[in-house]
Amino acid sequence: HKAVEHILSTVQSGQDIALISDAGTPGISDPGYLLIRALKQAGVKVTCLPGPTAFVPALVMSGLPSDKFFFEGFLPHKKGRQTRLTEISQLPCTVIMYESPFRLQKCIEELILHCGEERLACIVREISKIHEQAVTASLSELLSQLNTAKIPQKGEIVILLGGKEKEKKVKKEHSIIV
């Protein structure tokens, strides 16, 4: 927060700044929004130039429905994680999450517990790089591929979870035996 105050005073003294990131678009799943909010509250004009954002190409490559989606970003590491996974498991749209390669397998295991083995999902890694990979399958198949190293647990990871399907109502036929 001290950096925000320093940058704000720099801008207010008449200097221009540029907010850049080596991890995608600033403000998407990072604290860059704090600076942007402070600048806007101070009446500073903020302009955004389009740039790399991992979740858009991941959504396209996944083949999952893209007409409606929910961007979660990084899940909480500890506090509230299981509650959040329960909430996410009930969403009827595609859910997009970022995950560390070191927590990828655990995350898929947790998704299986909350969503079931057959929920469709996709792991996309290393977008726009030489080892780019997008694997869409059931959660249980994705876990199997992680266990056999068909999906390396390296690089930048995007997990896309298919939405919860509406339960089909089954008509019950009643018969009376006399």
Regions found by a protein language model. Name each.
Residues T25, S29, L75-K78, M97-P101, ...:
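Conserved phosphate/pyrophosphate-binding and hydrolysis machinery centered on Walker-type P-loop NTPases
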Residues S9-V11, L35-A38, S62-D67, H114-C115, ...:
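Short, hinge-like loop/turn segments at secondary-structure boundaries
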Residues L34-L91:
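Class I SAM-dependent methyltransferase SAM-binding "motif I" and its flanking Rossmann-like core
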Residues P26, T53-V56, K129-I130:
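Short gly/pro/ser/thr-enriched loop/turn and capping motifs at secondary-structure boundaries
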Residues Q12-D16, C93-V178:
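A contiguous loop/helix-start segment that scaffolds small-molecule binding in enzyme catalytic cores
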Residues H1-C48:
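Class I S-adenosyl-L-methionine
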Residues A3, G24, P31, R81-R84, ...:
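Helical mechanochemical/support elements of P-loop NTPase systems and associated helical scaffolds
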